[in-house]
C-alpha cells in the first residue's frame, strides 16, 4: 500500500508520537511548530504555535488532553491538545532535550542539556492542576546529572521510577521518591543513546544507539536481552505491540550524508525479529536519515519521521501478518 506522506514541517523531524488510541499522530521538528495529524488519512488538524527554537521532544498524556514539548528556546510547554493553547510555559536554563508524561498523567518529567555552563538536570512537575502559575512553581523533584547528559527518558512501572539513557551509552533507573539512582546498566552501549521505547506491557524497552546497535533491555533489572546489529548509527527503534518485531531507523549524521546514500539503502526502515535478532525486511522512503519511529497502537501500521522533514505513515499488507519464521 502507498504510504501517507505528511508534509507540514519545513525542517527535519525530531520526534513523532501516537496518542493511546492511535487516532492522532504528533510530530515536532527543528522548525519551532509541533503538528498534530489525523493518522487515518494524514489530515493535519493543527499546529502548536509558541516556541522560538527547535522543538526536540514531545509527549501526549493518556487521555489526549495535554501535550508537553521541550525546545531549544529554553522552555518546556504544556499545551491543550484540542484548542492548541499554551497551558503553562516553564523556563529552564538550557535546552529541554526530553519530556514525558507519567502513565497516571499526574506528573511530567523533563531534562535539560549540559550546555552554556549549565549541568544536565532531570525535573519532575505536578501537572494535575496545570495553569500559568506552573512557571513560577518549584519542581517537585530535581536531580542533577553529574556524569553524562540525558538523551532519552522513559517512565518505569507504576510511576515509581524513571529510566534515563545517556550520551555516553549508560542507562540508569532513578527512584523518584528518594531521588536516587537504583540501577545502572554499565556500558552495554559504547556510544550515546538516541532513543528508548517501551514494549506494550512495559516489561522491556528497546534502545537505539550511535554505536550502530539497538538493544532490548528488561525494564526493572536493565539486563540486556537481545542485540540488533546494523552498519550505521541507529536514531530510533520501536517494538511492535502485536508481533515479535522491532523496527530500526537511522543513517549517518546529516553532515556525512551524500545524495548517493539513498541508493545504497542507508535510510531504510529495517525490521528485525524480536527474539531471533534477524533482519527480515526493509522499507525505503526517506531521502535522508530517519530520526524517529513509532508503531501505531494497533500494530497494523507504523510512522517514521526523517531528516527530510516528511512524516510517512505506512500501513502493513496482509502478507506482513502471515510472515512466520520457520
Swiss-Prot record:
Q: Which domain of life is it from?
A: Eukaryota
- Indicate where this protein is primarily found: cytoplasm
For this protein, the record's InterPro entries field holds:
eIF3i, WD40/YVTN_repeat-like_dom_sf, WD40_repeat_CS, WD40_repeat_dom_sf, WD40_rpt
Q: Example GO biological process term?
A: formation of cytoplasmic translation initiation complex
Q: Which GO terms describe its cellular component?
A: eukaryotic 43S preinitiation complex; eukaryotic 48S preinitiation complex; eukaryotic translation initiation factor 3 complex, eIF3m
Coiled coil start-end? none
Q: Name one GO molecular function term.
A: RNA binding
Query: Repeats (WD): which ranges?
Result: 8-47, 50-89, 145-184, 188-227, 285-326
The record's section on Pfam families has: EIF3I (PF24805)
Record's subcellular location: Cytoplasm
UniProtKB keywords: Cytoplasm, Initiation factor, Protein biosynthesis, Repeat, WD repeat
Q: How does it assemble?
A: Component of the eukaryotic translation initiation factor 3 (eIF-3) complex. The eIF-3 complex interacts with pix.
The protein's role, per its UniProt record = Component of the eukaryotic translation initiation factor 3 (eIF-3) complex, which is involved in protein synthesis of a specialized repertoire of mRNAs and, together with other initiation factors, stimulates binding of mRNA and methionyl-tRNAi to the 40S ribosome. The eIF-3 complex specifically targets and initiates translation of a subset of mRNAs involved in cell proliferation.
Similarity remark: Belongs to the eIF-3 subunit I family.
Give the matching HAMAP family: eIF3i (MF_03008)
Kindly provide the name given to this protein in its UniProt entry. Eukaryotic translation initiation factor 3 subunit I
Give the originating organism: Drosophila simulans
Amino acid at each position: 500500500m502507498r504510504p501517507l506522506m505528511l508534509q507540514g514541517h519545513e525542517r527535519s523531524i525530531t520526534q513523532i508520537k501516537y496518542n493511546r488510541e492511535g487516532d492522532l499522530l504528533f510530530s515536532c521538528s527543528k522548525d519551532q511548530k509541533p503538528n498534530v495529524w489525523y493518522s487515518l488519512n494524514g489530515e493535519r488538524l493543527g499546529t502548536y504555535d509558541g516556541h522560538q527554537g527547535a522543538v526536540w521532544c514531545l509527549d501526549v498524556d493518556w487521555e489526549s488532553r495535554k501535550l508537553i514539548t521541550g525546545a531549544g528556546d529554553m522552555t518546556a510547554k504544556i499545551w491543550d491538545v484540542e484548542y492548541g493553547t499554551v497551558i503553562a510555559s516553564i523556563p529552564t536554563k538550557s535546552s529541554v532535550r526530553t519530556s514525558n508524561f507519567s502513565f497516571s498523567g499526574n506528573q511530567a518529567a523533563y531534562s535539560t542539556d549540559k550546555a552554556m555552563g549549565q549541568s544536565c538536570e532531570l525535573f519532575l512537575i505536578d501537572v494535575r492542576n496545570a495553569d500559568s502559575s506552573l512557571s513560577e512553581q518549584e519542581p517537585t523533584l530535581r536531580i542533577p546529572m553529574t556524569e553524562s547528559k540525558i538523551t532519552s527518558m522513559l517512565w518505569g512501572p507504576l510511576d515509581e521510577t524513571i529510566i534515563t539513557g545517556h550520551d555516553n551509552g549508560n542507562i540508569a533507573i532513578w527512584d523518584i521518591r528518594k531521588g536516587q539512582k537504583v540501577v545502572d546498566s554499565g556500558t552495554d552501549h559504547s556510544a550515546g543513546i538516541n532513543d528508548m521505547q517501551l514494549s506494550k506491557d512495559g516489561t522491556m524497552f528497546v534502545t537505539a544507539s550511535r554505536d550502530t546497535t539497538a538493544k532490548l533491555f528488561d525494564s526493572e533489572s536493565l539486563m540486556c536481552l537481545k542485540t540488533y546489529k546494523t552498519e550505521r548509527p541507529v536514531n530510533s527503534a520501536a517494538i511492535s505491540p502485536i508481533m515479535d518485531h522491532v523496527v530500526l531507523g537511522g543513517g549517518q549524521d546529516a553532515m556525512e550524508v551524500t545524495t548517493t546514500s539513498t541508493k545504497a539503502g542507508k535510510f531504510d526502515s529495517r525490521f528485525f525479529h524480536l527474539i531471533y535478532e534477524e533482519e527480515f525486511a526493509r522499507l525505503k522512503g526517506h531521502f535522508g536519515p530517519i530520526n524517529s519511529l513509532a508503531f501505531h497502537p494497533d500494530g497494523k501500521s507504523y510512522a517514521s519521521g526523517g531528516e527530510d522533514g516528511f512524516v510517512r505513515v505506512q500501513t502493513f499488507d496482509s502478507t506482513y501478518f502471515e510472515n512466520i519464521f520457520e
